[in-house]
């Protein structure tokens, strides 16, 4: 059950020859979500093979380089004959701006579009096994959110060898005990689930910051994350500029990753001055947090489960 993250746009503020502006897709069990939708996102989706059958789009904030692609994306979906509803999630007090952007050109969509405002600290439940949590970031006073994609804990690993030793026939009884039910065998023995099933296992956690200064909100949300996607607009030599504009340097992002104990850091939102050559940013970040990658348009990150489930009974 891999989880696939695709970087559709990795530039800061404006597109360059090498990079489009902000957009990230996440695909899990056939469902695709989009985080931010900078101009030209629908073309990037075509280019990198991302399905247009999105269920939701999450905006970190509504600055133009994260927003202006939604008009074209909705138009493309309408031309493709979409009828399914689409939900757009956006920070508190930004729905009006988002609605105005959608209505540019005066064309109606062929499907319902629902706009939902979110507060920091809220949670969007996705079925029974994962959710999307919001957290506060610091982008020079702009209404902004970061998002944490959080899978619920999974059942512990089932021990098939011990089950056979105990004389439990393979089949429905294995599934019942793995779901936590005690079972009674024909000889009257009662076997508790804890005998055959290990401790519950953590789900995956992916954190997307959007535009931000280093902040406590990100640090808390990123604790033990499998993947932290942090903006990195500038190198350390432009630290004053980063502070002035509400952005982060590569070193600052790496320091957050180190403090939070994340497994992997991917940097995005790269200033045009580094668009072709990101070596300085990469070296700066890796000097603090070695497991760092600077994303390019088309970069894919696949996160497998920490343990294979092939031997798990149904």
From Swiss-Prot:
UniProt catalytic activity: Endonucleolytic cleavage of RNA, removing extra 3' nucleotides from tRNA precursor, generating 3' termini of tRNAs. A 3'-hydroxy group is left at the tRNA terminus and a 5'-phosphoryl group is left at the trailer molecule
Binding site for Zn(2+) 1: 61, 63, 139, 211
CDD domains for the chain: RNaseZ_ZiPD-like_MBL-fold (cd07717)
UniProt entry keywords in alphabetical sequence: Endonuclease, Hydrolase, Metal-binding, Nuclease, tRNA processing, Zinc
Stored HAMAP family: RNase_Z_BN (MF_01818)
Cofactor(s) recorded in Swiss-Prot or TrEMBL: Zn(2+)
EC number in record: 3.1.26.11
Protein name from the UniProt record: Ribonuclease Z
Pfam families: Lactamase_B_2
Binding-site positions, Zn(2+) 2: 65-66, 211, 269
NCBIfam families, per database record: PRK00055.1-3 (NF000801), RNase_Z (TIGR02651)
Family membership: Belongs to the RNase Z family.
Class in the EC hierarchy, top level: hydrolase
């Amino acid at each position: 059950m891999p989880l696939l993250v695709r970087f559709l746009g990795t530039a800061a503020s404006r597109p360059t020859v090498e990079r489009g502006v902000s957009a990230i897709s996440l695909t899990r069990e056939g469902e695709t979500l989009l985080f931010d939708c900078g101009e030209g996102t629908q073309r990037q989706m075509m280019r990198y093979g991302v399905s247009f059958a999105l269920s939701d789009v999450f905006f970190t904030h509504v600055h133009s380089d994260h927003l202006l692609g939604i008009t074209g994306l909705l138009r493309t979906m309408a031309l493709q004959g979409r009828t399914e509803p689409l939900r757009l999630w956006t920070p508190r007090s930004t729905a009006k701006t988002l609605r105005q952007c959608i209505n540019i050109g005066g064309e109606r969509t062929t499907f319902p579009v629902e706009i939902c405002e979110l507060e920091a600290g809220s949670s969007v439940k996705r079925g029974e096994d994962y959710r999307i949590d919001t957290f506060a970031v610091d982008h020079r006073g702009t209404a902004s959110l970061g998002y944490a994609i959080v899978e619920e804990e999974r059942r512990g690993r089932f021990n098939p060898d011990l089950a056979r030793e105990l004389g439990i026939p393979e089949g429905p009884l294995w599934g019942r005990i793995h779901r936590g039910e005690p079972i009674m065998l024909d000889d009257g023995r009662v076997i508790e689930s804890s005998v055959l099933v290990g401790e519950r296992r953590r789900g995956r956690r992916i954190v997307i910051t959007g535009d931000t200064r280093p902040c406590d909100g990100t640090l808390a949300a990123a604790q033990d994350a499998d993947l932290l996607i942090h903006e990195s607009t500038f190198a350390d030599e432009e630290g004053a500029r980063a502070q002035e504009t509400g952005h982060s340097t590569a070193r600052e992002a790496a320091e957050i990753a180190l403090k939070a104990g994340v497994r992997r850091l991917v940097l995005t939102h790269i200033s045009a001055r580094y668009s072709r050559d990101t070596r300085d940013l990469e070296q700066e970040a890796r000097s603090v947090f070695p497991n760092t990658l600077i994303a390019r348009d088309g970069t894919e990150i696949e996160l497998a489960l920490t343990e294979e489930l092939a031997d798990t009974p149904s």
